[in-house]
Amino acid sequence: VFHSPALFNFIKENKDNYKAIIPITIDYSHVYYTTLYAPEKTIVIPTMHYHKTAFRSTLTQVFTKAAYIAFNTTAEQKLARKIFGMHMAPHSIVSVGIELSAPSDWAVTQEKYNLPDEYMLYVGRVDQGKLNNVYTYFLNYKKVYPNSDLKFVLVGKQYSDPFNHPDIIYTNFVEEQEKISIIQHAKIVINPSLYESLSLILLEAMALKKAMLVNGNCNVLKEHCHKSNNAALYYTNEKSFIDKLHMLDSSTNLRLEMGEKGYSYVNSNYDSNIICLLYT
């Protein structure tokens, strides 16, 4: 857990040297102490979702005394309004800008990690809390559609035991340029998380014109589906997962159409130049 008394003292003693101080995420104590010592200069980026962290009593001061609250999505803003009510500090949806690194050489990357030609991709922390039922759903999909060549590739540090199956491939940690190349060559990108405040991987994948499949039980991910005109499809149970995955797996035209929609969605809403103007 991040906790730095030295940082908090620095903010207290040097706040007059800054026009604004921007603590990111409510998960750690820095957001509380920044608001305590420099409320008039604090712009909070909460990155909150429906989790016990959001209901800490100390956050009442953060969300009512800060100069401004910059949310990532409408769903996040609605959650905060339900918790903190009419006394919440001035706020709006600001979000973040998306900038992508240049990709690594695909032939080298594919050989290094023994990646297949057709795969559904997950990028993030590899643990059961983030993946939910996606292993079971995917393997049942392969049973229903045994002729599918689709594999499941997971990129990220492993925090739980691997699920051993020939159709499931783990890369563990990869470099940023390698990650971009792996996203570029994915057939489908998935985010099965139930808790998100934005989902950078969704925006990165859309910026690279990839079709997305997401957990519709997460309000933030579902919001992206609607706002992007279905550049991402969502599932809510095993049946809808299998149905939506088959749609994507079997239709090149659908994936291309969704890719163009996603690219447009990110350029219109998550361009870094546009986001920076909102903070001025």
Language-model features, listed with the residues they occupy:
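Aromatic "clamp/platform" in nucleotide-sugar-dependent glycosyltransferases that forms part
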Residues: 194
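Conserved small/polar residues in nucleotide/adenosyl-binding loops
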Residues: 279-280
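Conserved acidic donor-binding segment of nucleotide-sugar-dependent glycosyltransferases
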Residues: 227-239, 247-252
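Donor nucleotide-sugar binding/catalytic pocket of nucleotide-sugar-dependent glycosyltransferases
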Residues: 41-52, 59-105, 115, 122
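Short hydrophobic beta-strand element within catalytic cores of glycosyltransferases
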Residues: 211-215
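A short, well-ordered alpha-helix in the C-terminal region of glycosyltransferases
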Residues: 247, 254-268
